[in-house]
């Protein structure tokens, strides 16, 4: 389990772009984290003012940040900078709205040098909001 202060020790992201609020579970190859989505998120001002929906690209970014926590937790990557290197087979199945708690689960399926590949799923209330494959580069 990690709180926001521990997350900030690992990730270089900061408000308004830090999209992980807590980590519930972390192992060498898997992370389960959460983003509490509130109406106060800056992106809701324009996406969309009369019907606020979390942008899909930010759901994917939240998944990438969660996956980066798993990688940066490894001794050889501590203190390094994570870069989002690619996405594949991403599908959006449910809108994420203010008040939702986004559960972010990333399983690292392959690690080759400083390049990692993960299977990522974001859910709200047990229903898939987004899933796909993500690629990381650690610099």
Swiss-Prot record:
GO process annotations (BP): fatty acid biosynthetic process; lipid A biosynthetic process
Keyword Cytoplasm found: yes
Active-site residues per Swiss-Prot or TrEMBL entry: 47
Main location: cytoplasm
Keyword Cytoplasm: yes
Any Pfam family: FabA
One GO CC term, this protein: cytoplasm
Reaction it catalyzes: a (3R)-hydroxyacyl-[ACP] = a (2E)-enoyl-[ACP] + H2O
Localization per Swiss-Prot or TrEMBL: Cytoplasm
GO MF, one annotated term: (3R)-hydroxyacyl-[acyl-carrier-protein] dehydratase activity
Entry EC number(s): 4.2.1.59
Keywords assigned: Cytoplasm, Lipid A biosynthesis, Lipid biosynthesis, Lipid metabolism, Lyase
Function per UniProt: Involved in unsaturated fatty acids biosynthesis. Catalyzes the dehydration of short chain beta-hydroxyacyl-ACPs and long chain saturated and unsaturated beta-hydroxyacyl-ACPs.
NCBIfam families the UniProt entry points to: fabZ, PRK00006.1
Protein name as annotated: 3-hydroxyacyl-[acyl-carrier-protein] dehydratase FabZ
Organism: Clostridium perfringens (strain SM101 / Type A)
Gene: fabZ
């Amino acid at each position: 389990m990690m709180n926001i202060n521990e997350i900030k020790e690992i990730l270089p992201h900061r408000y308004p772009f830090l999209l992980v609020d807590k980590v519930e579970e972390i192992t060498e190859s898997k992370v389960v984290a959460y983003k509490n989505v509130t109406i106060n998120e800056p992106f809701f001002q324009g996406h969309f003012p009369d019907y606020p929906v979390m942008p899909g690209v930010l759901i994917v970014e939240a998944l990438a940040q969660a996956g980066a926590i798993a990688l940066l937790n490894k001794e050889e990557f501590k203190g390094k900078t994570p870069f989002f290197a690619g996405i594949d087979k991403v599908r959006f199945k449910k809108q994420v709205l203010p008040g939702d708690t986004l559960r972010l689960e990333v399983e690292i399926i392959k690690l080759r040098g400083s390049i990692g590949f993960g299977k990522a799923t974001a859910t709200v209330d047990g229903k898939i909001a987004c899933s796909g494959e993500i690629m990381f580069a650690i610099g």
